[in-house]
From Swiss-Prot:
Listed name of the protein: Cytochrome b559 subunit beta
Entry-linked HAMAP family: PSII_PsbF
Organism: Huperzia lucidula
Gene label: psbF
Keyword Electron transport: yes
Pfam families found in the cross-reference section: Cytochrom_B559
Length: 39
């Protein structure tokens, strides 16, 4: 089946995007929060 062949690639790509996006958004949120607290 073609689904079994494309499924792992799609999953790895999804994990890679979220693995990079989640820490980036979290770090941006923490940096902005620290700046708000300092002011």
């Amino acid at each position: 089946m073609t689904i079994d062949r494309t499924y792992p690639i799609f999953t790895v790509r999804w994990l890679a995007i979220h693995g990079l996006a989640v820490p980036t958004v979290f770090s941006l949120g923490s940096i902005s929060a620290m700046q708000f607290i300092q002011r």
